[in-house]
Amino acid sequence: MKRAIVVVIDSMGIGAMPDCRDFNDIPECNTLKNVCKFNHGLNVPNLAKLGLGNIQDFEGIAKEANPIGQYGTMKEKSNGKDTTTGHWEMAGIVLKEAFKTFTQTGFPQEIIDEFIKRTNCGGVLANCAASGTKVIVDYNDEHHATKYPIVYTSADSVFQIAVDTDMIPLETLYDWCKIARKMFDDLGVTVSRVIARP
């Protein structure tokens, strides 16, 4: 075989992992089952033909007597639950140590100070775990007044930088992201992703 194509439906969980409480999840979590229940079914005939409905009882997804694909659920060996950890494991990389998250407190002041120093951005706003749409709305006026980037994280191991590209050029945002990536690597802080949010 010359090539394999892997299609991932990211964040479509089908039940909790045994270590769910280590990552502040509840044992009852099941994204697909809850989406099916909320919508009173789900019209996914091709996934049903592949055997998706045979994994569990999902409202509106039929069981397939003769599926055209292989189906099942998997349990990660890696220590972690974020997108990157799962994708890396599918490619054969098992992480013994989870990527660092900053969900409870935001990033330590030393990291923020180092980011400000390396980028010469003058300061940052937010520095908390937040929904991207909400944090941008909450800090929009202050962002326009100061031109400081909005820096935030989530439940995943991410350092996200949001700016209004009418004020801060897109190329500057990308440069700041490259600087942040190198900074985390230099400091030995295992942050999975640095994300630009123009």
Please identify what each model-predicted range represents.
Residues 1-5:
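Extreme N-terminal starter segment of soluble prokaryotic enzymes
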Residues 154:
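Active-site neighborhoods of enzymes that stabilize oxyanions during catalysis
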Residues 11-147, 157-164:
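Active-site nucleophile/metal-coordination loop of metallo-enzymes that catalyze phosphate/sulfate
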Residues 157, 163-198:
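Extended, H/D-rich, highly charged conserved domains that either
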Residues 149-151, 194:
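Hydrophobic faces of well-ordered beta-strands that scaffold small-molecule active sites
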